[in-house]
Amino acid sequence: MLIVSVGLMLCQKWFIYTVNHTTSLSGKVYVIKKGEPVQKGDLVGFLWQGQIKYPKDVIFVKIVSGVEGDRIVVKDRDVFINDKYIGRAKKQSADGKLQLEVISSQVIPKNEIFVSTPHKDSLDSRYAKVGTINKQYILGKAYEIF
């Protein structure tokens, strides 16, 4: 029993496990390797800052779609990063309760990333109230378990 307890404590030092309760990504369970740097295209685990809908410090997993220095361009409500189509920003949430403003065209600031998923109902950086995510809230690189 002691060996199992020590093993679990060591795992918690380096890893975080989280469950995805939405359909924005295909996986349901993810492991986040604490402190592992992320690059464009990686899954990232980060702490939600409570801007809308979910409480502060809920763990979110999204795809890194843009990094500092990348150019976000919005045309109508279509969002592009460095001319790559990311997705369309909806006018309201899937349940119709929230009005959603699209992020503004800009260069992603230093120490920030743009996160998204391909799902049309994903609450991500396409929306002004979410915006880019500061690196201080990034937990690490995420991996889908199942």
Where are these regions (language model features)?
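Protein maturation boundaries and topogenic segments
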Residues: 1-59, 107, 128-146
